[in-house]
């Protein structure tokens, strides 16, 4: 599925702003600069096991690295690689239906991204007048993921098991979902100068994806008998673990397992240390 038109338009506008700023910067006293850094933090997701609760989950550590190309004191381009680790359990939910479903997953998402940044005020590492600024960012990323679930202390990759009947003859079963995809990262942050060569960044960003399978839960229960016969007992065990069954039915085939058609999203919260990798500014600063 292609991104919504308004998301694409917003991204194009940002790129045009960056391009125009490069022309302006060539006429000023500002020299372009390059910085790089590393980030640590955590993340959360919005999906079947956490439908609408921001900043909820069993937070796991994440990390990454990046390089930033500052076109002037307002605009920059950042290329980054980041690992976000998610861990969720239905049993943590206050929703009785979700808690009764009793599923869980973990997912290590590796993401490569390119984003455009806009500083709220003029900012540059090494400029004593540029102590602090807020900033916005948006761009495009490519990510890979593989949800897993645990039985008796062993974690199993879920996509090959087809827990909703993917790749089997069960009713309404489709193909196995992709484990790579594109996302639109967007968010905001704050930059704090530490001296001539370094800075701290604090950032929150959402990733709008086009997959409903970060958690391996999307549509309807497959036939447990078909899963066991065609995909194996492990697929059947990890597909269904409800505490109480609707209508006392042993096989829930066709019953709702997730929210079909609602894509998952994930967010990243991080603190990063940034340092300048070209020469320290020595010219007089613009006032």
Role assignments for model-derived ranges:
Residues 75, 80-160:
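Gram-negative (and chloroplast) outer-membrane scaffold detector with strong preference
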Residues 45-51, 87-92, 125, 145-150, ...:
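Outer-membrane beta-barrel proteins
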Residues 32, 57-61, 108-112, 132, ...:
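Residues that define the transmembrane beta-barrel architecture of outer-membrane proteins
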Residues 74-77, 124, 196-200, 279-283:
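Repeated loop/turn-to-beta-strand initiation elements of outer-membrane beta-barrel proteins
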């Amino acid at each position: 599925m292609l991104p919504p038109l308004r998301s694409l338009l917003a991204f194009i506008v940002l790129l045009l702003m960056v391009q125009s700023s490069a022309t302006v910067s060539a006429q000023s006293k500002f020299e372009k600069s390059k910085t790089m850094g590393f980030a640590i933090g955590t993340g959360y997701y919005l999906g079947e096991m956490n439908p609408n609760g921001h900043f909820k989950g069993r937070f796991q550590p994440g990390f990454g690295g990046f390089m930033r190309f500052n076109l002037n004191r307002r605009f920059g381009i950042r290329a980054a690689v980041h690992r976000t680790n998610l861990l969720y359990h239905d049993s943590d939910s206050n929703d009785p239906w979700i808690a009764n479903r009793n599923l869980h997953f973990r997912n290590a998402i590796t993401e490569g991204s390119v984003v455009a940044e806009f500083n709220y005020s003029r900012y540059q590492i090494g400029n004593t007048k540029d102590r602090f600024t807020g900033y916005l960012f948006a761009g495009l990323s490519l990510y890979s993921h593989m949800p897993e679930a645990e039985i008796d202390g062993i974690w199993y990759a879920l996509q090959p098991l087809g827990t909703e009947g993917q790749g089997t003859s069960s009713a309404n079963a489709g193909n196995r979902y992709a484990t790579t995809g594109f996302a639109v990262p967007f968010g905001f942050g704050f930059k704090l100068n530490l001296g001539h060569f370094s800075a701290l960044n604090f950032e929150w960003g959402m990733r709008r994806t086009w997959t409903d399978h970060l958690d391996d839960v999307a549509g309807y229960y497959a036939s447990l008998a078909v899963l066991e016969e065609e995909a194996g007992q492990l697929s059947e065990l990890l597909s269904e673990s409800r505490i109480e069954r609707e209508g006392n039915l042993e096989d829930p085939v066709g019953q709702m397992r997730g929210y079909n058609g609602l894509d998952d999203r994930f967010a990243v919260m991080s603190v990063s240390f940034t340092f300048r990798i070209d020469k320290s500014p020595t010219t007089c600063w613009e006032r």
